[in-house]
Amino acid sequence: MATTFGSPSGDSRRGVASPRPKGREAKNTFCRNVTIYGHCRYENSKCRPPHLPDHVLNQNENAKKRFNVDSPSFTPLTTTPNGSVTASARNAAISPKAANAAVFTPKSQRSAVSTPNLHNKEPALDWHAPDFQEFVPETFGGPMVDSNASASYSGYDPYTSSANLASIAGQGHQSSAMNPYAQGHSGLEASYYQNPSAFQTSPAYHLYWPVGPQPTSLLGYQRTAHDFFIPDALREDLQKRAEVARQVMPNSTLPVIEQFHSLFCLDTTPQKNNAPFGYVSWIYKAISGKDGKTYALRRLENFRLTSEPAIRSAQAWKRIFNGSIVTIHEAFTTRAFGDSSLIIVTDYHPNSKSLADEHFKPMQRFNGRQATSSHVPEHVLWGYIVQIASALKAIHGSGLAARLISPSKTLLTAKNRIRLNACAIMDIVQFETARPVAEAQADDFVQLGRMILCIANNNTTAHLQMQKSMDHVTRNYTARLKECIQWLLNPQPPLGTPSSPTTPAPGSKDIDNFLGGISDQLASVFDSELHAQDTLTNTLGRELESSRIVRLLVKLNMVNERPELDASQQMSGGNTSNPSSVWAETGERYYLKLFRDYVFHQVDANGHPVTDLAHVLDCLNKLDAGTDEKIALISRDEQNVLIVSFREVKRGLEIAFQDLIRAGRGQGK
């Protein structure tokens, strides 16, 4: 049956009224009009589904607000006497709204609080930028190092950073901390605006490539490239000494003292120290204008000379020449520094350091913390004792006393090679209050024993805890060394008691008895020095004829490319003035040109230059010996090939060089 448009029917009523719920779980479904529009116009007439109560609607609206006056107040948990939380308190502390709380998002992972999107079908992969610690300018701090330890033993190391040298270039030796935030060339811009007076660091000679494994299948007459040069360790040491000796301070404000100029301060710390002379002392490196040699100048600030014989007491030290004493050359006073200063001129030993720097200086490689030092071998200690005893023999034999034997005033100039430094200073400073010579000589033995005891214990204050220090010596060294140290530390014994460290013969405590007691150690140290001398002699002998290579190079470069010599000879003989043809392709000296190209201008199969030191040394050695080995000399255009021997090349080179000498003599040169 057909119906007209708009006529009532049974299905038209179903589209106007609320949908009829179906199923048994539909009884708990509330009206959708309330959830969508907030109210239902058919609530009292036609709508069948149940509606939400008013207090529930108000609660949902209040939940959307940020501040709600109906929210429960904060109630802290209450604990029982035994410390446990009661069940009622635990239940009251958790709100029913906690189930609907949003997921916690840390603040560091989100830059801003964003509203969650309820209609996302796929989880969004948001990228959260990590938070960085905010930079807060603070005081520019230095390295974590003990200031007392670093100030006590801060020796001179020419191969470390030279930042501290600029602060000691002037007279005041004052240092100022760098401000990294200051505007100007003195701050962080110093790396781009270099100061022309900055100290130049030395080349890294110690970074040379070491000698690799040596082939063992060489014949008796075969050599490697390293056999033609001195050992790397000796070469590096000599190069470091030469580099240190040539160090200067550009734009230095240090004055010229007498004939000494180009002063360079060797103290790397600007802190003043009055010990042990009683005056603030500095040490400089200077060049003498008389002989051009380098000397060390020790300066004592604010020294007032009250007696002329005091300064003349250094004349006796100038007559002492001993290998274990730093030689003294001159002593005088000056006002070049703006005050009355005492200057002691001594020999300069480059790249040397004191025994305090060698054995007691904190290791800077472990963040400024002093690392556990290695055990000092006993033969090293005996070497120190023998060398100081040799110095005391020369000093006491001249009627003088060292008066100052300490690790900070004993120089280590080479491996296990020490020298007494700062001699004659105490004689000048304490001239009026000087002790008797015999008493001062006896005190030299005590100071020597203290120094050896401190080095053996690796502690500068070991002599203050005598029993503990001697126990350490007993555990780590032989009884012979312990007996020697005890003899040195004991005071002057009365007459008729044993005085030698090994022999019970009575006598006074002097240097002769001491040398007699350590005679066996004298022989051991002397034998070691002989072996070291033999090694240096063999190394020097290896370099004896190294100049013959230079002589060949000089001859080749003087003879080659000299056609004007032959032209002048022909002019004097009345022949044609054209250049001689001896250097032409058919000349008798043409092979000298080809030999030069054969030795120095080698190329590979692709025409690339080849720099082979072994080939150059091999050819020059064979040329110097004049062997009969034949070589093929090829011209640069590869059109001429000459087969000659090294003997023929050597003979032609000598003839050409003799002609050059005769031509020079003929012109009066």
Swiss-Prot record:
Give a yes or no for keyword Cytoplasm in this entry: yes
Which region is the signal sequence?
Answer: none
Q: Where does it mainly reside? A: cytoplasm
**GO biological process entries:** mRNA processing; nuclear-transcribed mRNA poly(A) tail shortening
Q: Does the keyword Lipid metabolism apply?
A: no
Q: Which UniProt keywords apply?
A: ATP-binding, Coiled coil, Cytoplasm, Metal-binding, mRNA processing, Nucleotide-binding, Zinc, Zinc-finger
Q: Where is the composition biased (Polar residues)?
A: 1-10
Q: Listed GO cellular component terms?
A: P-body; PAN complex
Identify the PANTHER family for this entry: DEADENYLATION COMPLEX SUBUNIT PAN3, PAN2-PAN3 DEADENYLATION COMPLEX SUBUNIT PAN3
Q: Domain remarks in the entry?
A: The N-terminal zinc finger binds to poly(A) RNA.
Q: What is this protein called?
A: PAN2-PAN3 deadenylation complex subunit PAN3
Gene symbol of the encoding locus = PAN3
